[in-house]
Amino acid sequence: MNNAQTQSEKIVQLLSEKTMARAHEILKEGVTAATLARAVASGKIQRLTRGLYQLPNAELDADSTLAEVSKRIPKGRICMSTALAYHGLTDQMPRQVWIAIGAKDWEPKLDFPSIRIVRFRKPYLEYGVERHMISGVAVPIYSVAKALADAFRNPKLVDRSVAIESLRSAITQRKASPSEIAQAAVDCGAWKVMRPYLEAMTHNG
């Protein structure tokens, strides 16, 4: 009984520090599966989705969904419209979390939250990845410049009007310099498409 209580306290302490944790992280702390199940049943902790837990009174920010996805898909990178929205470049919030994985990676299936998978080859997958702390989780998100390059390079995935709006926001808000944006566009194969828009905005600015 005392041991079970100690294990229960371990769960609460871990979730207090990390905001959310996967089952294997909790079990690694010496907690049994039975104790974990009892903690959920008693309301001490909350099951967000399969294998992911948090405290019931946890204060989660608006981007906590990104932390959930990152926990469930550790190899993924937040991309496209979701990355643009995270950086404050567009007011159009995507209904799904856009996440990039490798060309040959296994495609994950989540019941919640809703995700949209994009496959990138190795150079594009690793380029411009930043780690942002969200709800205690280091979430890999593409930089402003990389997210813009992806948006212009993939017009079937991101509407051109959204890409242009995001580019203008990045420049006016100084989220990235024109040279940084241009370099990412060159490196990611989007320069030919982006160039006239970027040059017009910088000449007018």
What are these regions (language model features)?
Residues 43-50:
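A short, conserved structural fragment
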